[in-house]
Amino acid sequence: MLPGVKVTPEIAGIRGVEAGVDCRSPAGHTAFSDVDGLIDLVERIASATGLPVGIKSAVGESGFWDDLSLRMARTGTGPDFVVVDGGEGGTGAAPLAFADHVALPFRWGFARVYRAFREQDLTEDVAFVGSGKLGLPENALAALAMGCDSVNVGRTAMFAIGCIQAQKCHTDRCPTGVATQSARLQRGLDPTLKSVRCARYMASLRFELLRLSRACGVEHPALVTLDQIELLQDRWESIPLRQVVGYEDGWGQVSSGDRGELVDMMAADSDPAPEATD
């Protein structure tokens, strides 16, 4: 449900609804129904805006991604970046059954997508973004090792500015003022204070990522390989992440040219530690 206060005249005109009135937003749409339609839509938007155009998706069956990567390899068209959202990602609006049981967890879902593009030799032409509880340094590090060019941070950044997971996002009645258009409730969020806390969180995340990568013997988190990350199993066993996600040697790693640039960049970065919090 899109609250009426968010349905501006511009949005109303685009969606064909009445301005200022709550608008139901069904999961279905008519923009496209297959891979060819998706690619056509992406290309039309890119042509009209001159900007990179990407797609975001939670992951279930693999057929769509196999088909998409094959069409992109054949035609040289398609999205410029792909955002893969793990099923464990946070939301305040999804039905409980969807939040708990729909879509694969990030590591399994992203691996399916990356493998499809890697088999078509497209991973240097498409940027990959990970999402889904990646605001923790160990999770972000694994995502980068799996082939992500960057990671999205949502839940943990919201915690930093006061989110208490009241699950009221879709009602416009967030009690802490984080996710609301209500002027009264917005007073619960002090930008002067919360902006500093969010900045400190981001600086700390970066600092911890760098510490983990240096513990692995490399200069930058993107240089950590899947063989350097193991997952603990029952009965005191562990398994390399590469084996879990089914990657071949070299998959997920940056190119030799990018590796050199990262090393040079980090050599020039003094990497100061984040300031201590109050």
Which residues make up each language-model segment?
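Fe-S-dependent hydro-lyases/dehydratases of central metabolism
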Residues: 1-14, 18, 40-44, 48, ...
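Proteins with a high burden of low-complexity, intrinsically disordered sequence enriched in S/T/G/P/A and R
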Residues: 1-2, 21-26, 270-278
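Proline-rich intrinsically disordered, low-complexity coils
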Residues: 3, 9, 52, 79, ...
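Glycine-rich tight-turn/loop motif centered on a GG-T
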Residues: 4-33, 92-107, 190-194
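A generic structural signal for ordered alpha-helices
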Residues: 16-23, 46, 60, 91, ...
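Glycine-rich phosphate/ribose-binding loops and adjacent secondary-structure elements
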Residues: 29-186
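Alpha/beta catalytic cores of nucleotide-metabolism and tRNA/nucleoside-modifying enzymes
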Residues: 101, 112-125, 135-278
